[in-house]
């Protein structure tokens, strides 16, 4: 293995000099190791005369010029397979949950894969029209997820992206008994801790691999941690399993790329983002795909800066998604959770050829009633309800019931709301909304529709009011 020495350190950027005949390749992992220190660097640029510019995967505190650096001769490698289930690892595949080294039940040997891999060839890729039931009413009705598809949860700060993601993991792990990989990219350490304990309490931890690179980590770490999680998911997929990949938050991945780009001296583009924004997003998203062996269904939380969906980061992410779930601050302010906007959320799966005519017509009926209610709100605010035609009064009444019925108590939020969590099957979901549209429940008070699961619970609640 070739060795070099550190000649310059500027924060997370470290320049290393090698002999000209043994210069490491781009993205190779380099190791700095002495009695006090062990740090992995990733090669980003070859500057000429044997010098490479690298990004540190950990803190560069304590580094000094002249330290010996070893070229490991490969990209960063991480453990994959069932040994990672129920454990928390970092970007380098090291355990950070104080439970000791990874153990493999089936054999002593744990497999390691490089995090930089090519996407599957066109010949190996496969598409699937099967719907993935989540048990969340508004998602299953308005923006259904496809097995092997990509879903984005878009929302500003504090509208419920992480809570929605935790509920999806809980529902899919409990109801569908599949494997999940959760990748925390630049998010709060507290949330990562809460998430671990929530999964443990729900008894689904043994089906989830957790990969964390939190917001206190250097930018190189946050830029690569999504690839670590994806590599673990790819291993499960190639073993013939249907795996769920959760990334929270894809915006922090973009932000880490912006920081690295600035550190490397690249000229920024629109709104200060890196000039390679579309390419970096594509590198990650193109690998999240299904093959003939198994599928990867990905759910990605996307922070929307200043609630502006035209910002380059969320706008670039949009192009890669099959379903977009948009969380609205306006709906959250009404106390309706999950605060998903049914008029701004879309799915390619909402097609009569895929979901069937009944589901498609019910979803469109719900959206048209809510859209008409939205248009009438200005008239109601100025003139009041009494000035509306009888037909519109009835429509407003149904719209308010639909709006409240789209709320749902979550299992992961039981401690905050005091309501026990509910899972609603797609069949019951369609039947209930179809009934509301047809006016079967016009005689029930609208408060009976708030924070319940099925329509039977609405009828029970109405009797007590």
UniProtKB/Swiss-Prot annotation:
Keywords: ATP synthesis, ATP-binding, Cell membrane, CF(1), Hydrogen ion transport, Ion transport, Membrane, Nucleotide-binding, Translocase, Transport. Belongs to the ATPase alpha/beta chains family. It is an enzyme of class 7 (translocase). This is ATP synthase subunit beta. It is found in: Cell membrane. The keyword Cytoplasm does not apply. It comes from Buchnera aphidicola subsp. Acyrthosiphon pisum (strain APS). Its EC number is 7.1.2.2.
